[in-house]
Amino acid sequence: MSARKLQVEIEKTFKKVTDGIAIFDEVYEKLSASNSVSQKEKLEGDLKTQIKKLQRLRDQIKTWASSNDIKDKKALLENRRLIEAKMEEFKAVEREMKIKAFSKEGLSIASKLDPKEKEKQDTIQWISNAVEELERQAELIEAEAESLKATFKRGKKDLSKLSHLSELESRIERHKWHQDKLELIMRRLENSQISPEAVNDIQEDIMYYVECSQSEDFAEDENLYDELNLDEASASYDAERSGRSSSSSHSPSPSASSSSSSENLLQDKAEAEEKVSADASVQDIAEKESLDADKELATNDQEDDEEENQAETQKDGAISNNENMQSEVQTTNPSASTSAVTNITKPTLIQNPSTPLSVSNSKVASPETPNATHTAPKVEMRYASAAAAAAAALAKESPSHHYIMQQVRPETPNSPRLNSTVIQSKWDSLGHTASPKMQTQPVRSVSQSSATTETNVKPTKEENADVPVSSPDYLKDLVNALNTSKEQHKGAIDKEKLTEALNISCVYVPDATDAAKPQYYIPKDPYPVPHYYPQQPLPLFDSSEMTELVDPDTLFYMFYYRPGTYQQYIAGQELKKQSWRFHKKYTTWFQRHEEPKMITDEFESGSYRYFDFEGDWVQRKKADFRFTYQYLEDDDDWTR
């Protein structure tokens, strides 16, 4: 008996829910069609009253759904879902009513949509509703399947229950398949890859499946989505996604790149060690041969013309050897080669400080004694290789020094004398003016030039310490540059005087205000007054704080009788803060007397106050006035 009473109570509640939803829909339609603000507020109150009744019924339904006395809870869940849907609609109405009609957001909402865009949005909306309905049905079927599984007994199989369970599972899979298709249609609609008309053509078939798929005599259309070619779209989407994943898999990993970089570093280090060892061996050989060349300097007094011709022939051979060996030496480290050649030339300068540089290096290029004819090719070969290494490094570092090497010419007997100390001092001056990397290159250039040029040394008894050598053009240029730099340093300005002059010049640096011309006050109606009266207006009249303290009549006076001044600008800004708006057609300030009766995208109409500045200088009221937004002075300020 109690179960029957409970069932009657549930049916009464369902009837109340149906009636309440019908009343809610009726009030909602009236609210959507209304244009009056006051009427909308009244209808919103009616909606709120009705939704509260539905919420109480929803709480009762939730209580019954949670109890175990009722076996079939499908109707309870359905009515609860309907009430919750109406609650969501009421929330949307509340958000819309909170937006003011004359605000920016309100005007943007009221903007008209394109008909095609509106049709697309409507199509997306009903597809979304269909997906939600299928999701709800799938949840109910899953709940039924779970309850059916709970009735199975251990060790016993009921074939009828099993067949019913398999039927439920197939229906769930079919629902999910349709959900995927509908979601794909929505995605293609949003991307404008399919027209809304093509989707609306199959709307009836889709809604037939959504509403009648649970009936016994339902016949499903297997070719429902064939007209939309969704299989090709899904295949292209899957191919694009797989392409992105494959491209990401082909990218090298950080660990692989780091391992390859470490292997490259180890390989470079090994090559550098091999180059250093090779350069060291070349350096040792060059030092030994330079000592042998110094010992043979004593035999240079017995030279004749025949030996000079022989020296020319050997010089040509040394140059050819230099060219042949240059390709092999170029692979060595330039820095190591520089140090090696520097070490070759320095012992000669130290052992014989009074001997010219050309004397110490002449035998390197052309030994002239008959006893040294067998060892000369070896000496020239080794010195040529060292000189080629220096030339390769020098050509990489500085083209100017390569040009200096080419400027060296054979000396003549009538050339002026230049001892080694003078040459060393000039190279030192070159080192001071050059960069640190290039400081060792001049010495290297001298050794190379001495190895590739012909030198004829004929010392006499009177020339014990100084030997005539050629003065190349590049040395003359260096001497001139050195003298010029010394003269410039002598006439340099003292740092203290320079700082003092700079500070004095900064005192008169022009300011940003110097760019604008000063605007002096010129009275409109000048009248002679005593000097103790103010000759200019107070700065207070040009401040926005003053406009906040005066009444609107004063603001109107400042606006109309101070044209083109800053006072007119601040008066207009203050009037806008007080909800006054300027009409450009009538050149009059208007203010809303009440809420407008009608608001559109182009105008609004209602009762307004305006200031009569041409007549009686008073505020007047004008009813049923249409304010066109075209003549509004500032749309942003008006909608703020």
UniProtKB/Swiss-Prot annotation:
It comes from the Eukaryota. Residues 301-310 have a biased composition (Acidic residues). Residues 266-277, 285-298 have a biased composition (Basic and acidic residues). GO terms for cellular component: CCR4-NOT complex; CCR4-NOT core complex; cytosol; nucleus; P-body. The modification Phosphotyrosine is found at Y474. GO terms for biological process: nuclear-transcribed mRNA poly(A) tail shortening; regulation of DNA-templated transcription. Keywords: Activator, Coiled coil, Cytoplasm, Nucleus, Phosphoprotein, Repressor, Transcription, Transcription regulation. Residues 37-162, 287-331 form a coiled coil. Residues 245-262 have a biased composition (Low complexity). The modification Phosphothreonine is found at T369, T433. InterPro entries: CCR4-NOT_su2/3/5_C_sf, CCR4-NOT_su3/5, Not2/3/5, NOT2/3/5_C, Not_N. Residues 319-374, 436-458 have a biased composition (Polar residues). Its main location: cytoplasm. It is found in: Cytoplasm; Nucleus. The modification Phosphoserine is found at S248, S249, S251, S253, S366, S385, S435, S449, S471. Residues 235-374, 432-471 are annotated as: Disordered. Acts as a component of the CCR4-NOT core complex, which in the nucleus seems to be a general transcription factor, and in the cytoplasm the major mRNA deadenylase involved in mRNA turnover. The NOT protein subcomplex negatively regulates the basal and activated transcription of many genes. Preferentially affects TC-type TATA element-dependent transcription. Could directly or indirectly inhibit component(s) of the general transcription machinery. Belongs to the CNOT2/3/5 family. This is General negative regulator of transcription subunit 3. The lineage of its organism: Eukaryota, Fungi, Dikarya, Ascomycota, Taphrinomycotina. The gene is not3.
